[in-house]
């Protein structure tokens, strides 16, 4: 991820129209991930988790939840929220790490790895490098989920409509109308115009995952509210399988 994108996500930004939006966003993602946890004993990695306000929902469904976040201020908030000695949300099943710590973890550490709304901010080379790490970290028969993949024909208008539907169903519709106007003049729109977002055809992701040693397929639904975006599920192939 470029320093510009990392600084954006680690700062004060206009992506969420208000606190209600942010809460609903993270609760929906946590509920969706919790349903994917393969067993109550599974160790789960959420890579690029952001503020993960409702990580406790995922942790309740798993043996352990590891939150991996590159943005230092966001990571500090996560540690204070879930791992601090005095934090009201302290949860012994949640661990917060940086990407460099993840890369030092032993082989076969996880039964589920989730990468949601991340790879559009990475180059294809960066994503390929990550897949190699994930392939090593996953246990035999475990699962990798890549969510919020933007197809080449994905439009900002589709994202806006999905957000408006979410807002209407959850009581922040008027705030969203104002928030979308603010977003037009925000750093996000400027960065998106300058740096772009990495987009993938379905077949391109399938090929990339296959080359990294996974048996992949498109998931029936995306994690979260935006079903115009894609999600993929993959399991590491055993050494004897081609």
Predicted regions span which residues?
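Class I (Rossmann-like) S-adenosyl-L-methionine-dependent methyltransferase catalytic domain
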Residues: 1-37, 41, 51-104, 145-242
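Structural signature of beta-strand start/N-cap positions in the alpha/beta core
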Residues: 43, 64, 109-111
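Conserved beta-strand/loop positions that form the S-adenosyl-L-methionine
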Residues: 47
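A conserved beta-strand element that flanks and buttresses the S-adenosyl-L-methionine
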Residues: 114
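Short catalytic micro-motifs in class I SAM-dependent methyltransferases
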Residues: 117-118
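Helix-capping/helix-break motifs at membrane-protein junctions
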Residues: 123-124
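A short glycine-rich, Lys/Arg-flanked "PGG" loop and its adjoining helix->strand segment in the class I
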Residues: 128-140
